[in-house]
């Protein structure tokens, strides 16, 4: 039973670490992203300093692409389901 609990805690800590990353840590740079399929209806804008746990459901449940902006409002990158899966 203790082995199961230890393995569960390791997994939980990885999930917690991931959720506490900031948007800028997992985004694709703006110049490397294909913007051809983006519309206003399938995007969600966040600041680069926002933690992933605050918008992860928007990506997974609503299938939105997150537009990451800096403090001046300039787009610096994008986050899709692929970035969540690969990190």
Predicted features and spans:
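Tandem CBS (Cystathionine beta-synthase) repeat/Bateman regulatory domains
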Residues: 1-87
């Amino acid at each position: 039973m203790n082995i199961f609990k230890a393995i569960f805690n390791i997994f939980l800590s990885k999930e917690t670490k991931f959720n506490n990353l900031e948007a800028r840590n997992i985004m694709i740079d703006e110049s490397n992203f294909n913007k051809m399929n983006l519309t206003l209806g399938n995007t969600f804008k966040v600041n680069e300093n926002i933690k992933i746990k605050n918008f992860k459901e928007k990506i997974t449940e609503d299938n939105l692409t997150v537009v990451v902006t800096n403090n001046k409002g300039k787009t610096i990158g994008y986050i899709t389901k692929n970035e969540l899966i690969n990190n």
